[in-house]
Regions:
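N-terminal positively charged helical leader segments and presequences
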Residues: 1-91
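RNA substrate-binding interface of SAM-dependent RNA methyltransferases
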Residues: 92-162
Length: 162
């Protein structure tokens, strides 16, 4: 995980986020982060920047973010009052590649890997299509459900930072 992706519901106040799922487990056990350590973070469909680990409470952690403008929370939190706009750690995500991947639907085992790899490489548009050799049963796989696709794309995004 090269980028910790934060969601709207992770924010507890202006520039503080609290996470207690697989991301916090990864930060504590893989990164072996301690209080005061800096981590790369990004808001889904928003800015990329850094966060400082401020609190560890079991499997729950709190991060203080420095992400800049472009943070549009769906809550009543005012994020513009404590944001350092001139921070060297704040940046826009890379410009999307002008690329569309058109691919015949692969075996269900390969769907996860393809989605993760495409997200890691920055591919924004993926089109699965039917072809002569595609088994009709492949279209019934649960891996093509929206939440499963989203999960694999997020895993790839965490690696590629794009």
């Amino acid at each position: 995980m090269n980028l910790i992706i934060l969601f709207q519901n992770d924010f507890i106040q202006k520039n503080y986020a609290r996470i207690n799922d697989r991301r916090s487990d990864h930060i504590l056990n893989i990164h072996r982060a301690n209080i005061g350590d800096q981590l790369s973070v990004g808001i889904l469909n928003g800015m990329i920047g850094t966060a400082i680990l401020r609190k560890i409470n079991g499997a729950e952690i709190e991060l203080e973010l420095e992400l800049g403008l472009g943070l549009e929370l769906e809550t009543d939190v005012d994020v513009t009052s404590k944001v350092n706009i001139t921070s060297p750690y704040t940046k826009q995500p890379p410009t999307p590649l002008p690329l569309t991947l058109i691919i015949a639907l692969p075996r269900p085992k390969m769907i996860k890997r393809i989605l993760q790899t495409c997200a890691t490489m920055g591919v924004k548009d993926i089109i699965f299509l039917n072809s002569y050799r595609v088994e009709k049963s492949y279209w019934q796989t649960p891996l093509l459900q929206e939440d499963k696709i989203q999960e694999q794309l997020l895993l790839g995004l965490e690696q590629g930072k794009d």
